[in-house]
UniProtKB/Swiss-Prot annotation:
All residue ranges annotated as the Protein kinase domain in the record: 45-303
Annotated gene: MKK7
Name of this chain's protein: Mitogen-activated protein kinase kinase 7
Keyword Nucleotide-binding: yes
Reactions mediated catalytically: L-seryl-[protein] + ATP = O-phospho-L-seryl-[protein] + ADP + H(+); L-threonyl-[protein] + ATP = O-phospho-L-threonyl-[protein] + ADP + H(+); L-tyrosyl-[protein] + ATP = O-phospho-L-tyrosyl-[protein] + ADP + H(+)
Length: 307
């Protein structure tokens, strides 16, 4: 008797970006995320140089004038669209809630309503992000990184926070080989058991099948998308290139949608240990209900490599 695989039907309509409508300055101090200062004021820190620039602001390396402690300062301009205003308020609320050695720590949030600026003071990670390590890590190193990232995800998920943008650029490293989760700009706090959060946000290259397929996503595990992204990222670090497409091929939305929704999940290459191949498989199962959770993955035999 022939087995017939159920054909996946997905919504192929792409979202239309909202119009860029700018709002007057919004005071985040009056929102659900109170201003954090930890005893540090904006005048206590001095900018040293730029670490990075984005469409919404600039990240500086700064130091405390009295203690000499080094921090990263993310400065965001107040001339923002409604969507970005909500995004920033959500990020600040998550930073207020989190306190974990596996999540980049927020040291202060400063407002300048007159000039329309918000600055977020964070711990400084002197090793950059994991992008620079693609193709240059061993299984043992990956196991050590994975253990820390999964502890961070397990912590966030226990607080009902879905990150929605796990990728090498958002995982920061320091000189002690500690890896921490950063950038909560598109994250979401799940406030009800039926909250639906599999929308077109984050980096599409790391989106799970249910996030491309909005109809299927409504009934999926809201946290499982983070595990898919984690699995793609771990495999990318090992093989040295984005694993869902041939090396050198630039991912685009339509190609990724077809590969992720209709193709077979990527596998670890030949020559890897059975434990690593199994670990990747547990992360990259097409059905979200079959993917292991962060807590389950922490008990996987592959992570014994990091002990």
């Amino acid at each position: 008797m022939a087995l017939v695989r159920k054909r996946r039907q997905i919504n192929l309509r792409l979202p239309v970006p909202p119009l860029s409508v700018h709002l007057p300055w919004f005071s985040f101090a009056s929102s659900t995320a109170p201003v954090i200062n930890n005893g540090i004021s904006a005048s206590d820190v001095e900018k040293l140089h730029v670490l990075g620039r984005g469409s919404s602001g600039i990240v500086y390396k700064v130091h405390h004038k009295t203690t000499g402690e080094i921090y990263a300062l993310k400065s965001v301009n107040g001339d923002m669209s409604p969507a970005f205003t909500r995004q920033l308020a959500r990020e600040m609320e998550i930073l207020r809630r989190t306190d974990s050695p596996y999540v980049v720590r927020c040291q202060g949030i400063f407002e300048k309503p007159i000039v329309g600026e918000v600055s977020i003071l964070m711990e400084y990670m002197d090793g950059g992000n994991l992008e620079s390590l693609r193709g240059a890590v061993t299984e043992k190193q990956l196991a050590g990184f994975s253990r820390q990232i999964l502890k961070g995800l397990s912590y966030l998920h226990s607080l009902k926070i879905v990150h929605r943008d796990i990728k090498p650029a958002n995982l920061l490293l320091n000189s002690r080989n500690e890896v921490k989760i950063a950038d909560f700009g598109v994250s979401k706090i799940i406030t009800r058991s039926l909250d639906y959060c599999n929308s077109y946000v984050g980096t599409c290259a790391y989106m799970s099948p249910e996030r491309f397929d909005s109809a299927a996503g409504e009934n999926s595990d809201v946290y499982a998308g983070d595990i898919w992204s984690f699995g793609v990222m771990i495999l990318e670090l090992f093989v040295g290139h984005f694993p869902l497409l041939p090396q050198g091929q630039r991912p685009d939305w339509a190609t990724l949608m077809c590969v992720v929704c209709f193709g077979e999940p990527p596998r670890a290459p030949e020559g890897c240990s059975d434990e690593f191949r199994s670990f990747v498989d547990c992360c990259l199962r097409k059905e979200s209900s079959e993917r292991w959770t962060a807590s389950q993955l922490l008990g996987h035999p592959f992570l014994r490599e990091s002990l």
